[in-house]
């Protein structure tokens, strides 16, 4: 099955790709191709998903929610990365919102003072658009119309990234998180979705599906490993970070991220505490307590299926212990040990 879906990718990515500065991304472009995407997706294997009316579709060795797969195919076909672009790559619920805030604050620190930074009034997701969500479904958001924007994000597995991303030479940062906490964060997050597709499966059933790789963009461990291997082959193009180590001591990692992005902090900035200011501005505690991220407030640029507050639950390391039994924890730990054995991944970031 995997070879068939990878062949499908090859078939749909032969289009001549324009620069995303020049791409006509009106909603009609996605809409006129959407039926073709849906017809293609209807031929792929599917399984029961975490909601009764939302199946998971197999494509390229990974599992997808139908709408996100449509967006992925559209990005593969039409998104054209430039060498100057920078992508925040991740699996869902692994620190994406935090990393988006950091990359935006680092890249734009000379444009705003402490009181005028847009992060104080708007959600970080508004400034670093997803190439498989915002680009196809919401092409009119202001950040996509800004030709000077170079920050983008994606949950797309490395093997299925648009060819232009891989070939352009643009840089990427990938963040991963301990799988047990990732699962709990995802399961609780899905309960906050505004949807008519039915309730989320109970904890035990959802956990079993997660362990079997049946989750959006899953299997999660494969997702991590693919980016890890790409990082090992291209350390000058990919920065590989772990959520837990960054949370424990963010300053050195933020400095490394800035240097990697080409926006390194000067000695004068370090003396003035600019690094600390960026870390504090983007901290979980700061962002969660901003008015823009409270209650049922939505992002300003487009409709959202989640309120802004949904992206800020606890941000704690080890919260899984409040939900999972020792047997469940042992199961996922065993899967991780088996998958990552001999790769050097478990030792990275310790």
UniProtKB/Swiss-Prot annotation:
Entry superkingdom: Eukaryota
UniProt xrefs under InterPro entries: P-loop_NTPase, Sulfotransferase_dom
Residues bearing the modification N-acetylmethionine: 1
Outcome of substituting residue 301 to G: 25 time reduction of activity with desulfo-benzyl glucosinolate as substrate
Cellular component aspect of the GO annotation: cytoplasm
UniProt enzyme class: transferase
EC number: 2.8.2.38
Transferase is among the record's keywords: yes
Residues given in the record as 3'-phosphoadenylyl sulfate binding sites: 93-98, 177, 185, 243, 313-315
Effect on the protein upon substituting residue 301 to G: In strain: cv. C24
Keywords per UniProt: Acetylation, Cytoplasm, Transferase
Signal peptide: none
Low complexity bias: start-end ranges: 1-17
Role this protein plays: Sulfotransferase that utilizes 3'-phospho-5'-adenylyl sulfate (PAPS) as sulfonate donor to catalyze the sulfate conjugation of desulfo-glucosinolates (dsGSs), the final step in the biosynthesis of the glucosinolate core structure. Preferred substrate are the long-chain desulfo-glucosinolates, 7-methylthioheptyl and 8-methylthiooctyl, derived from methionine.
Anything else known: Strong differences in the kinetic behavior between the same protein from different cultivars.
Protein name: Cytosolic sulfotransferase 18
UniProt source species: Arabidopsis thaliana (Mouse-ear cress)
């Amino acid at each position: 099955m995997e070879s068939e879906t990878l062949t499908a990718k090859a078939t749909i990515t032969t289009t001549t790709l324009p620069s995303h500065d020049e791409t006509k991304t009106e909603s009609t472009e996605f809409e006129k191709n959407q039926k073709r995407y849906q017809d293609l997706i209807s031929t792929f294997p599917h399984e029961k998903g975490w909601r009764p009316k939302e199946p998971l579709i197999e494509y390229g060795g990974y599992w997808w929610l139908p709408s996100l797969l449509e967006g992925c195919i559209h990005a593969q076909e039409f998104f054209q990365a430039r060498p100057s672009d920078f992508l925040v790559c991740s699996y869902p619920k692994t620190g994406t919102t935090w990393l988006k805030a950091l990359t935006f604050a680092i890249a734009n620190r000379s444009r705003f003072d402490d009181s005028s930074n847009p992060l104080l009034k708007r959600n970080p997701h508004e400034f670093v658009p997803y190439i498989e969500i915002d680009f196809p479904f919401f092409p009119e958001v202001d950040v996509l119309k800004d030709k000077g924007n170079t920050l983008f994000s994606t949950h797309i597995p490395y093997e299925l990234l648009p060819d232009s991303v891989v070939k352009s030479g643009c840089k990427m940062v990938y963040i991963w998180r301990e799988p047990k906490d990732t699962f709990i964060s995802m399961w609780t997050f899905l309960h906050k979705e505004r949807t008519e597709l039915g309730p989320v499966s109970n904890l035990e059933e959802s956990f079993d599906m997660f362990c079997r790789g049946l989750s959006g963009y899953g299997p999660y461990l494969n997702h991590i490993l693919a980016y890890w291997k790409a990082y090992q082959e291209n350390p000058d193009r990919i920065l590989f970070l772990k959520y837990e180590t960054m949370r424990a001591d963010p300053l050195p990692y933020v400095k490394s991220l800035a240097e990697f992005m080409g926006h390194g902090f000067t000695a004068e900035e370090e003396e003035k505490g600019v690094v600390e200011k960026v870390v504090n501005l983007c901290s979980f505690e700061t962002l969660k307590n901003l008015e823009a991220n409270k209650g049922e407030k939505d992002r300003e640029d487009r409709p959202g299926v989640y309120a802004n507050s949904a992206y800020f639950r606890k941000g704690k390391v080890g919260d899984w212990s409040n939900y999972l039994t020792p047997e469940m924890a042992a199961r996922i730990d065993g899967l991780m040990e088996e998958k990552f054995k001999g790769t050097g991944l478990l030792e990275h970031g310790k």
